[in-house]
């Protein structure tokens, strides 16, 4: 089994961090992007972010870009394996929502 298949559910911060890496970004830009995507509902601190970055690199889900030596900010991007893991999570969440909607619709039909 690949790591993407073994990934399990992503935490909400990890979900948004991985989503953000669909575009190459540096750490601070990720923190800003997550706040923007979630309308300020999710805020990621530097410790959480860089811990997640290290974990995602270890899993092979993101990679560092080779920037110019003069660049102070290190940029990262999602890998194919990271995209596979992310899309697996999106599918899991869609199935979860479909199950919930089915139960709600059935309950509403019985109440009517």
Locate predicted features.
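Basic amphipathic alpha-helical segments that dock to polyanions
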Residues: 49-50, 56
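Beta-hairpin "wing" of winged helix-turn-helix
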Residues: 57-72, 77
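Intrinsically disordered, low-complexity serine/threonine- and proline-rich regulatory segments
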Residues: 1-10, 96-98
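Basic, amphipathic "hinge/linker" alpha-helix immediately C-terminal to the N-terminal HTH DNA-binding motif
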Residues: 71-90
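A cross-family signal for key residues in well-ordered alpha-helices
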Residues: 19, 32, 54, 87, ...
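N-terminal helix-turn-helix DNA-binding core of bacterial DNA-binding proteins
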Residues: 5-48
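Amphipathic alpha-helical dimerization/coiled-coil segments
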Residues: 87-112
């Amino acid at each position: 089994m690949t790591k993407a298949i073994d990934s399990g559910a992503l935490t909400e911060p990890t979900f948004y961090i991985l989503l953000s890496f669909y575009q190459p970004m540096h750490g601070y830009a990720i923190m800003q992007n997550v706040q923007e995507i979630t309308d300020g509902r999710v805020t990621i601190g530097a410790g959480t972010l860089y811990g997640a970055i290290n974990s995602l690199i270890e899993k092979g889900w993101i990679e560092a870009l080779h920037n110019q030596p003069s660049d102070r900010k290190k940029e990262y991007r999602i890998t194919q394996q990271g995209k596979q893991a992310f899309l697996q999570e999106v599918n899991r969440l869609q199935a979860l929502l479909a199950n919930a909607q089915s139960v709600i619709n059935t309950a509403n039909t019985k109440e009517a």
